[in-house]
C-alpha cells in the first residue's frame, strides 16, 4: 500500500507517521504543505514555516522517510482567503479552516502531486469508519481536540482516501508517545487559531485586507452611543473580547453593515437574546440523516453540541430548531450536524429567526 502523510512540523502529524510505521507500512512519503501567508504579511508577524520545515526534516530523518514541500500559497489565497475577505465585507463570520481542509489539504494537494496514493494520512483528531465501502466521519476519542467540525465539508470520495490514526488517542497519550520515542518536536506547542495565519493575529490580517473605518458602538436597548470602533468586519455576533467599555461585560448583538454600527448589550440583557431557530443553506451531507431524531448541532468548534430538529424548506434551505438557546449565532458561520458521534455534514448559517 502506497501512503502519503501530511506533516505540519507539529507533534500530532509526527506521531501519526510513527503510528503508521509501527503498523508495518513501508511505502511512505511525507509532504509539507506551504500555505502560510507570512511572505506577504511578514511585516506584521513572524515566519513559522521555516521552523516547521526544520522539524519536518528532523522527523523524516529520524524515521528515514522521504519528504517533499508542496507550495499551495496561490491556491490557498484564491480558494480560501478571498472567500474569507468577501464574507467579512458582507458582515458575516467566515470559517476558513473548513475550506482549508476541503479545498486545499484534500483538494489542491491531490491536484498538485503527480503520484497516486492508496491512503492519505494526517494528524487530525477524528475517525473514519468503513463498513462495506460505506464511509462515515466520527468524532475523536478526545472530544476537546476533536476536529470533525472542520472536516464536515469533505465529500465521501475525499473521506474514502483518508486515515486519521490519532482518532482513538487522547492528546495526553500523543504527548507521552512523542516523549517515549524522543521526537525532535516533542516539546513543541500546539498551533493556535486559523491554519494559514501562523503567529499573525487575525485582526492584523483583517486590517491588512480591509483597513479601518470609524463607526459607532450603540447600546441596543437605549440607542445610546457608548463609543467607537474601527470597522464592523472586526466583530462577530456574541463577541465579548475587544469591547473596552466600562460597566461591562458587553456583547455584540447586531451589526448594521450599511451604516457601520455595532450594537451591544450588557451581560444581563444579552442573556435574554439567545436564539433557538435559524436557517442554513449550501448544505454538504456526508451522510444525510434518514430520520429527524437523535440529531445535534455544533454552531462553532468546541465540545458543545445542542440537540436539534431540522426541516427542509424550499430552495434547499433548512430550518434548524435547537432544544436550547445559543447566544452567538452569526450569518456566515457553519452549523455542523451530528447523530451521536457521527458527523453527518454541515451548512452555512443564513440568518437567525427566533
From Swiss-Prot:
A Pfam family the protein falls into? tRNA_Me_trans_M
Q: What is this enzyme's class at the first EC digit?
A: transferase
Keyword presence, Amino-acid biosynthesis: no
* An example Gene Ontology biological process: tRNA modification
Superkingdom in the source lineage: Bacteria
Q: What is its main location?
A: cytoplasm
Q: Name one GO cellular component term.
A: cytoplasm
Disulphide bridges, residue numbers: 100-195
Per UniProt, subcellular location reads as: Cytoplasm
Q: What molecular function does GO assign, one term?
A: ATP binding
Write out the catalytic residues in the record.
100, 195
- CDD domains cross-referenced by the UniProt entry: MnmA_TRMU-like (cd01998)
Catalytic activity as recorded in UniProt: S-sulfanyl-L-cysteinyl-[protein] + uridine(34) in tRNA + AH2 + ATP = 2-thiouridine(34) in tRNA + L-cysteinyl-[protein] + A + AMP + diphosphate + H(+)
Matching InterPro entries, A to Z? MnmA-like, MnmA-like_C, MnmA-like_central, MnmA-like_central_sf, Rossmann-like_a/b/a_fold, tRNA_2-thiouridylase_MnmA
User: In chain numbering, where does the site feature Interaction with tRNA fall?
Assistant: 124, 333
The region called Interaction with tRNA is annotated at: 145-147
Task: List keywords of the entry alphabetically.
Answer: ATP-binding, Cytoplasm, Disulfide bond, Nucleotide-binding, RNA-binding, Transferase, tRNA processing, tRNA-binding
The record lists ATP as bound by 6-13, 33, 123
UniProt family annotation: Belongs to the MnmA/TRMU family.
Query: Per its UniProt record, what PANTHER family does this chain match?
Result: PTHR43052, TRNA-5-TAURINOMETHYLURIDINE 2-SULFURTRANSFERASE
What role does this protein play? Answer: Catalyzes the 2-thiolation of uridine at the wobble position (U34) of tRNA, leading to the formation of s(2)U34.
Q: What is the protein name given in its UniProt record?
A: tRNA-specific 2-thiouridylase MnmA
